[in-house]
């Protein structure tokens, strides 16, 4: 087995099958949803899930058992598109055999020109982009075709947790990124609308709210800024986090709120992409490395125990060894707890795809490994400090067949623990060991009530 380290993915490329949900009894109709890509897509899939349930479909986990299959897709990197092509090939075969009746392609691929080719090649019945998913209502037989159709949402991890989208799109034009093309320019929801949704979710039992946006900290509405919204949500919700942020929008007040607000998870995901000022200019990121370092200093002061993660691209066209070494220095200076390290993937329609000075695959791989090893070294050292301590852990995913659950500390650390506690409960555990990406608890945690922990 190779000892080459691998970068952890932010979420699985294709979603894991969810527990089967039921539509109206007696309909006999079945549907399967597969989600590729970011948390925004996970949230969009929840909206579509409510549509199919409202239309009387029962959700199933396999294509073979489904009358209708919906692929909610990602277009950020070519390997994501390759995976979708593979799924479409399988679905095309099942349609020819009469085992699947209809296939819908939604999400970012649906908003790209390539969707026309995929539609004709694989016999896709419906293609939707990121701004017209409401049209799925008619596709599944709902008696409404109104753009305002907004199904009642449930938490995306069950009743205990929910994503709340506060804005869509992006106004930045990073050299490598296709998101503004397929998601459009930034559109922000009103503060009143967001708060109303949060209040409704909490009243229905949601305990953990995650605010979502392509550049979530860019949210602005009628004089309010993201820090105003975050503080308002934190005053209502028992537990709050947010993703994903852009350094150019990140205000000191927001960083301090992470540390000061008891209900905000002390975690910051702030993509830097490169530690080289020259490459940051080429990428059109809008900040310098020193400005990024200063923001991290504010965060570390506000939340000394908090977790910090980032995104880094290696092998962007024109990246030199000097640029790479500047990124390594920034990694050491910031001591990230984790990083999503990506080798540059050219996307048609982006500025970077047309640039020369291509970094060879072999060199990009070496730089990838060096960055990842530096990140993991820092992360492992920071996690080891937790060994022997006690943590209050929020259970995110209940125990598997082996009795092991996955939870999260208030500092944002992932924890593996043995417990019968249900998702949404808190458990007090001792940390016995650690890896670079996870803490491991003892075998006899004590379930604590939320009131007692508060």
Model-identified regions with their sequence ranges:
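Proteins enriched for Cys/Gly/acidic motifs involved in redox and nucleic-acid/cofactor modification
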Residues: 1-218, 268, 290-301, 325-333, ...
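Terminal RNA-binding accessory module
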Residues: 2-6, 16-18, 28, 354-454
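Short, solvent-exposed loop/turn segments at secondary-structure boundaries
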Residues: 80-82, 185-190, 220-224, 282-285, ...
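Conserved SAM/AdoMet-binding glycine-rich loop
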Residues: 101-105, 112-114, 203-322, 332
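Short, structured coil segments at secondary-structure junctions
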Residues: 120-124, 236, 410
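Short flexible coil/turn linkers enriched for glycine and charged/polar residues
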Residues: 156-160, 170-172, 264, 274, ...
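Hydrophobic, well-ordered secondary-structure elements that form the walls
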Residues: 270, 311, 331, 339, ...
């Amino acid at each position: 087995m190779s000892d080459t380290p691998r970068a952890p993915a932010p979420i699985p490329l294709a979603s894991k099958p969810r527990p089967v949900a039921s539509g109206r009894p007696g309909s006999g109709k079945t549907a399967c949803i597969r989600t590729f890509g970011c948390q925004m897509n996970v949230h969009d899939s929840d909206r579509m899930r409510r549509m199919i349930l409202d239309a009387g479909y029962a959700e199933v986990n396999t294509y073979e058992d489904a009358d209708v299959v919906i692929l909610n897709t990602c277009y950020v990197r070519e390997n994501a598109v390759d995976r979708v092509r593979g799924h479409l090939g399988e679905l095309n075969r099942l349609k020819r055999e009469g085992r699947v009746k209809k296939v819908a392609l939604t999400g970012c691929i649906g908003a790209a020109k390539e969707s026309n080719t995929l539609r004709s090649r694989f016999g896709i019945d419906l293609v939707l982009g990121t701004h017209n998913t409401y049209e799925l209502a008619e596709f599944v037989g709902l008696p409404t075709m109104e753009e305002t159709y907004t199904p009642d949402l449930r938490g995306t991890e069950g009743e205990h947790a929910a994503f709340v989208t506060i804005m869509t799109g992006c106004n930045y034009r990073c050299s490598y990124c296709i998101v503004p093309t397929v998601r459009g320019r930034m559109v922000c929801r009103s503060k009143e609308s967001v708060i109303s949704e949060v209040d409704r979710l909490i009243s229905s039992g949601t305990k953990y709210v995650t605010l979502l946006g392509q550049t979530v900290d860019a949210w602005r509405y009628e004089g309010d800024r993201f820090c105003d919204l975050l503080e308002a949500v934190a005053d209502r919700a028992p537990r709050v986090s947010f993703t994903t942020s852009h350094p150019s929008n990140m205000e000191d007040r927001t960083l301090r709120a992470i540390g000061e607000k008891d209900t905000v998870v002390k975690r910051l995901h702030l993509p830097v992409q490169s530690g080289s000022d020259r490459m940051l200019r080429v990428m059109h990121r809008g900040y310098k490395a020193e400005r990024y370092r200063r923001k991290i200093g504010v965060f570390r002061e506000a939340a000394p125990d908090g977790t910090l993660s980032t995104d880094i691209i290696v092998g962007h066209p024109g990246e030199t060894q000097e640029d790479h070494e500047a990124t390594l220095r920034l990694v050491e200076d910031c001591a990230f707890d984790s990083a999503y390290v990506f080798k540059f993937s050219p996307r048609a329609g982006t500025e970077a795809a047309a640039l020369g000075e291509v970094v060879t695959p072999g060199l990009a791989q070496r730089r990838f490994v060096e960055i990842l090893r530096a990140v993991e070294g820092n992360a492992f050292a920071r996690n080891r400090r937790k060994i022997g301590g006690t943590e209050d852990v929020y259970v995110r995913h209940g125990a598997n067949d082996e009795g092991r659950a996955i939870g999260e500390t208030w500092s944002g650390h992932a924890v593996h623990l043995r417990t019968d506690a249900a998702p949404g409960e808190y458990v007090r555990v001792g940390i016995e060991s650690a890896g670079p990406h996870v803490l491991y608890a003892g075998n006899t945690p004590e379930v604590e009530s939320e009131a007692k922990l508060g």
